[in-house]
A protein has these predicted regions:
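Active-site microenvironment for binding and transforming phosphate-containing groups
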Residues: 1-181
Length: 181
């Protein structure tokens, strides 16, 4: 589910809805910020030409089951704008070099995104899957920016990593706001 805030007066209600398990927040008004927290999952920020935006939390389930796609579709509905005009920013996440998964998860990635999402039969590339998914929905590849930073490779230095810490760690955040000036 995507929590949607269409006016500043709805912030408390949107926050409450998001806290019940939303994987994304879409903001369609000025003066409202969104913050989602991450460890190894991919933060995704989608921005429409109007300045309306969505922030999505994309762990492997969020990638495979389409939290990013639901956020994009919600933003398209909110703005009336087509996806080819949107910009997508993918923040730091666990890269394939450290993201070894079971056969069932690898199959789900392959079935959803094809060969590009797998480095080998046990290592998943969430960034490639996200880029492929956004492109399949009409977002131009040149409008998709991936910071290409691994949370495990930089654990403790720049980022928190659930996997690198053995399950005990802090979180880093993806913050988005529309500032008028």
């Amino acid at each position: 589910d995507v929590a949607v805030c269409e006016n500043a007066g709805d912030v408390a209600e949107t926050r409450e809805f998001a806290a019940e398990g939303s994987d994304a927040v879409a903001v369609g008004c000025d003066g409202v910020a969104a913050l989602l927290c991450f460890a190894d999952c991919a933060p995704v920020i989608i921005v429409a030409p109007s300045g309306k935006f969505a922030v999505a939390h994309c762990g492997w389930r969020g990638v495979v089951y389409g939290a990013w796609a639901t956020a994009l579709s919600t933003l398209c509905e909110l703005t009336g704008e087509p996806p080819e005009r949107f910009n997508v920013y993918i923040g730091p996440y666990i890269h394939a070099c450290h993201f070894e998964v079971g056969e069932e998860v690898a199959k789900q990635f392959f079935d959803s995104f094809g060969e590009a999402s797998l480095v080998d039969e046990r290592h998943v590339d969430m960034g490639a899957a996200l880029r492929c998914g956004f492109a399949s929905m009409g977002v131009a590849p040149e409008r998709i920016a991936d910071v290409d930073m691994c949370t495990v490779c930089d654990a403790g230095e720049r980022f928190y990593s659930y996997r690198a810490s053995g399950g005990t760690c802090g979180r880093h955040g993806a913050f988005a706001a529309r500032i008028l000036g």
